[in-house]
Amino acid sequence: MKKIVQNKFIAACLFIAVFAACNKDVEYVAEPLNVSEEMSYVKVIHVAPNFTTLTTLADKVNMLYTTSNGMYEKINGTTLAYDNMFPTATNTYVAINSGLIPVRFSIGGVVLADSINFYKTSLTLRPGKKYSYFLTDNVTSSAMFFEDDVPVLGNDQISFRFVHAILNDTAGKNVDLYSVKNAANIYENISPTIATGFEKKPFYNNDTLIVRRSGTGFELARINGLTTVGGRSYSVVYRGNGKVTTSTAK
């Protein structure tokens, strides 16, 4: 039986969203976000494939924050399951108050809107800044909360970061991100829970990007036909189940 590790790529741009699982094409395009210096902006991404196994809870997650009047308000719309994010690509961030903001995660209920709270924390949000919160298999960790500090770009530039969001891969956790077109690694030896900073990069025109075991040619996941647009900032997210093997690729 051919052994294929079931990992996936998301190429999720801040301004253009591109979702890919192996060889899927571009699906969504989003407009640039208008930013107010009085608010902060948050996106939540569910990349925990083993959420139900680890928590024994239904995989229908809500993220809520405390408003200025002390009430909790949902960040997301419909509940999130694995491989979902909110806002979707056509609406890139949720605007909420700045400061030290208590947040909680709950399970969307049938009778009650939020029947079970399973995690509480506080986030420090700076005015006018954008953030991404990745819900991983370490569901009670705030380690994957990042400021999306993108550089100022000209129309002939892009910025790019790589996010390693697979926490349940026991063998060879660190990975490289390889560009077929350039025949070279873009990033090397990236550990789980790490997001590189946004870096200015040349355009990618119909390139294939491959996640490989660090220091080897062993392929774990790929995205085919990646073409970028000048003036945009891209997040490429490596997520999925690092322990699952199967005879066919998904």
Language-model region placement:
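Intrinsically disordered, low-complexity polar regions and short flexible loop motifs
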Residues: C22-K250
